[in-house]
Amino acid sequence: MTRTSIALLAILPGVFPCRAADGSRIDLAKGWWIQSSAKVAEKGDAISGGKYAPSGWYPAAVPTTVVAALVQNKMYPDPYFGMNLRSIPGTTYGIGTNFANLPMPADSPFAVSWWYRTAFQLPTSVKGKRLWLNFDAINYRANIWLNGRQVAKSDEAVGMYRMFEFDMTDIALPGAANTLAVEVIPPTQTDLTITYVDWNPMPPDKDMGLVRDVYIRVSGPVSLRNTQAVTRLENHGELAHVTLYADLKNTAASAVEGTLKAAFDNVAVSKKVRLEANQSTRIAMPAQDVAYPKLWWPYGLGAQDLHHLRMEFETGGAVSDREELDFGMREFASEVDAEGHRLFTLNGKKILIRGGGWSSDMMLRYDDEREENEIRYARDMHLNTIRLEGKMMNQHFFDTTDRYGMLVMPGWCCCSYWERWRNWKPDDYRIAGESLRDQIRRLRNHASVFVFLYGSDNSPNAEAEKVYLKVLEEEHWLNPYVSSAAKATTPGAGPTGVKMTGPYEYVAPNYWLLDRTRGGAFGFNTETSPGPAIPVLQSLEEMLPKEHLWPIDEFWNFHAGGGGYRNVNVFTAALEGRYGKAADLNDYLRKSQAMTYEGERAMFEAFGRNKYAATGVVQWMLNNAWPSIIWHLYDWYLRPGGGYFGTKKANEPVHVQYSYDDRSVAVVNSYYRGFSGYKVAAKVYNLDLTEKFSKTATVDIGEDSVVRVFEIPEMEGLSTTYFVRLTLQDSAGKPVTSNFYWLSTQPDVSDWAAGNGRYTPIKTYADLTGLEKLAPVKVKATSRAEQKGGEEVQQVTVQNTGSALAFMVHLTVRKGPDGADINPVYWEDNYFELMPGEKREVTATYQRKLLSGAKPQVKVDGWNVQ
């Protein structure tokens, strides 16, 4: 079932009927009301009483933050448009500052606690059962009341990344109305809460609220929790040892004897257990050997086989409690090589990490369909990893990454109280440790989760690291762990083997292969990028008022980042220096898409060519928390830009590429199988498309390898702006891929001495202004649709009918000839070139429902397309 926290229910106060969908869980998502404690005189015992009648409260659905619920109730204008966010009371912190590190303004409506209240009726079938009230995340503290009695106090229910469960059996009323009231206390600058660092602004409530699911679990006298499947492989994956764990708790006043049973695939195992009165214990089941197991692999490297595990405790001839989950048989490991670089392996195979940093929605609204679309976008770009810096996401996210074969590297966030260990009090260490424990318990069974970073920009102090490592050991975390996203060494974990040396602003495409000291293509760069990513016009029109679309002004800057990234000045200077000064908004946008295409392609290509001297790179970022002009591969409205398709091109599994450092042509194979008899061809063209060089070669490509085929020589008589076109065919002559570069005889020259962790300035720009002289051309497009379930696939044929190059040809699918574009659309290719007369076929896949009944229309535009 898809739940979106912004889908609030406008219903009258009353009792919401509840039932357990599977006999063991009752969701409390609907029928909530919220109000500021400043407007409520009563205390928790009265508010959670059945006679209390809320007046003037706001309807809500959980999970939701306070601000998200108020926005849904139209109390404030869309905070994501223009500078509307600044109009919400309490948003007085300096633009570009990290609000998480500042106190809440005293006059902010969110400086006080807010009440969440719901009334629900429990089914009579739960009578005689144990009832457990669960909160999967509360930001940040809470006093919890049920039916007039306090279930938990704020010193107990505390911690954004904690998961809480309370025995409500003696308070609940089966077959009758129940009232739950939660007083949520906002986080302060000295709490272990969520932060968006310099990525984007923060809502004025600091995301306070019930921000994950609230539900009731039903069990017999013995509850079963924290089921875990641990897999170890032998003989190159031909044998898997699977060990199962579960936590049992006897709530009865006397001893209970029973049987713990587990089953997956064709394996069944059981164990007799005796639990004394009120005893809690962890049970390890006998290890099971599985011969020739179906292993889990990332997408493109093998199947995403998952195994369904059912665990239950039976006593007195009845099932007291059960849990079910899917797990993957796979084994991750890592090592720090002789150069100090961390290299990850999966099932005994090396893997180059190609990833992007993820952000949750700024108001922590969750949408299952959107999540799946975004993960599919990542996979479509041939990325294999998503990094979560403090944005742990919900269960659906991890279930989806398991199914899609997308690796996940979660960890804590930087630049907040999480890294101010010198100020931590004893309770902070407790909260941090229990936060890690709860997150590890929910992450460890997911095949896609392969590492945990218990530090971000910095490694924790010795005391915090001891707390973290103790938790990882106790919870059977067998995946790798790293103490920081930056280069560091700690007593408990040794060297991190990674770097966090930038850049984050625009750098020249040749930077990645020429740099030897900072962010270049060596080692594992945990967060880096070629800087801003300007959205296309349609997105800018949705995020900015018309009068602020051009020129770039404070509205643009508000949708940039914070700290040192509050504008796009570095990017714009490079754009004008390389492509020529923008004549207007459309000119700026076409040049932006070209520059982000070549920038992202260059970064990923460099790490691909240099594997395994380069062991990983994480693009900062994959997506944004709100509409932004920096750090994404597709924008808030799910429109992919030039950076998306540059990334997709660079990371294709078998890829031919040009090297900016030595002019070599290389083939990069990411498959765990080789290919023979492949034909590589390279052509060099002047701006007017006169051919200046041509060469072909036949190569054999080993599994997961790189072959440098030949070099393109320096040559005389080139136009200042010129082109290189590469093609790759298989042994039967079938096209595998192609690649197209626009280059200059005047290369970019970086000012290495002035470089820093933010960026390395360019002192001489490549001259690509010749592109402005490309003659206008017409590109003809025809398409035919094919239905595949709920999806439609457009087979699009485009042809350049002009006599000049068609540059950066861009396709969109629209709702009829004059309708809006639809997104997400998964294009086989986009922002490509067409030679005069050239014809190309590409596919576009999308959900048919996005058309809203209209007839799809493929629209063509481009750099010089009429």
Language-model-derived ranges and their functions:
Residues 33-39, 69, 79, 83-86, ...:
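Accessory beta-strand-rich segments of carbohydrate-active enzymes
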Residues 144-146, 239-275, 281-284, 663-700, ...:
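Beta-strand-rich binding/interaction modules
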Residues 173-177, 245-336:
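Extended acidic/polar, glycine-enriched regions
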Residues 20-97, 179, 183-189, 327, ...:
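Accessory carbohydrate-binding/adhesion or oligomerization-edge regions at the termini
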Residues 26-27, 33-42, 61-67, 111, ...:
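Substrate-binding clefts and catalytic carboxylate motifs of secreted carbohydrate-active enzymes
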Residues 293-323, 713-765, 823, 845-866:
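Terminal connector regions
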Residues 312-378:
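N-terminal carbohydrate-binding accessory modules
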Residues 385-563, 595, 599, 614, ...:
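Substrate-binding/catalytic cleft of secreted carbohydrate-active enzymes
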